[in-house]
Amino acid sequence: QLTNESEQAVKGQLIGTLEGKTFSIPVSLAAGESKIVRVTSKEADVLHLKNPRLWWCHNMGKSEMYGMDLAFEIDGKVSDKETINFGVREVRDYFTEEGYRGFLLNGKKVLVRSAGWTDDIFLRDTPASNEIQVQYVRDMNLNSIRFENIWGTSQNVYDLCDRYGLLVLVGWSCHWEWDNYLGSSCDEFGGIKSEKDMNLIARSLNDQVLWLRNHPAIIAWFVGSD
C-alpha cells in the first residue's frame, strides 16, 4: 500500500529488486491518497520464481529465505524504501482417522514439537534475549513455538523463527484485553456481542494477519486458546 502524505499529486516508479533482477511500475497518487498496488508475475517476470529454494523447518531441511528490495522514486529520487524478507513454502492440513489435525510442509508430514511463548511481564525482552530463547527451542530439538497470544513487541521474534526454522502457531489477543478494545466491561463469557463489536474485532484480527503475513514460519492462526 502506497500513501501520498503530501498536499500535491505525485507520479513515480515503484521499483523492486529480487535475486538481482529489477522491475519498475509507474504509479500516480493524488494528494493524500492511499492506494494498494498489486504486482504479479504478469507485470513483472522477476516475480516468477522457477525452482524456488524452499523454506523448511528445523530437522527437515534448510530454512531458505529471499529478500526483496522495494523503493518508490519520484523524478529519480528515492521517496521511501523497504526490504521485505519472505520464504517459499506450502502448508496444508489434514485429519487423522481419529479426528486429529495434522500438517503437511511442502507435501511432507511434519510432527509438530512445540514450546510455549509469553513475553516478559515487563516487556523487557530485547533482540538478543529473544534470540537466546529461540536458540533454546532448537537446542531442545523442538521445531515449533506456540504463541498463545499475538506475543512479540515487534516482528523480531518472528524473524528469528523464520531464520532458525521454527514453525509458529500464533494466537490472538486474549480475553483480558477486550475491555480496553471494546470500551466496556466483559463478563466471563466475553463481551463481543453487537455488530459494531464484531466488526471492530474482525478488523483487529485482519490487521494482525497483515502485519505478519510474510513470515513463512507461521503455519496457522489459532483464535481459540488451550
Feature-to-residue mapping (PLM):
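Secreted/periplasmic carbohydrate-active enzymes, especially glycoside hydrolases
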Residues: Q1-Q155, D159-V168, S204-L210, I219-A220
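Solvent-exposed loop/turn segments at secondary-structure junctions
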Residues: W151-T153, C174-E177, S225-D226
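Aromatic- and acidic-residue-enriched carbohydrate-binding clefts of CAZyme catalytic domains
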Residues: R113-G116, V170-V209, R213
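Catalytic-core segments of hydrolase enzymes
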Residues: R213-N214, I219-S225
